[in-house]
Amino acid sequence: MNRALQCPPWGSRSRTPATSQFSGSNRSQQWPSSRLIAAEKANTANSVSGPDYALSTANIYFASQPGQSLYGLVTLAPLNPNAAFGDPTTFGTDNDPMVGKAIGGIVVFGGGLALYSGKGQILGGLGVSGDTSCTDHVIAWKLRHELKLDAVPMGPSPEHNDNMILDIRNGVSPSGFGHPTCKGGQPAEPIIRTLSRRFPTGPKS
């Protein structure tokens, strides 16, 4: 079993969260910070993906490091405090203060994916937080597939989609879009390597 503690918000193409949800019986079972991290992951994946090419938040980990092509990205879209904070009893509900507001924020580790219709139209982003970033990526991938919002047109992975690329060795990512392996918890890396085969992306008939 591979699971995350925090269920995902997903946002529209206008970068406003459409919903915020938590897993478990109550919000106290979640990491409090995961609510915002998940929303920022959705915002990031939506912001860096387009109609012809998708980048997951995992794909931009190495690219955002000093000396790489996206260095400085994390400073470009600060978190919107008016959307992030409010009555904590509404967090993870339809009345969450972030719903319908531009949340902002950029996250450059796994758990955020762009959403595409069956015809390949980009619709927004999905973010999951609450476990290792590798497990968050797996949960987001499986959920996107279940929702049938994974008609990814192209991406940087060897399978030509936005799957996590685990190619960082000695601080270097040959692809330029690598993500480190994750420590702690149930290892997700073997699952990640089979996601494209078990839960394929691409245009749907």
Describe the function of each predicted region.
Residues 1-205:
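Flexible, solvent-exposed loop/hinge segments and secondary-structure transition points
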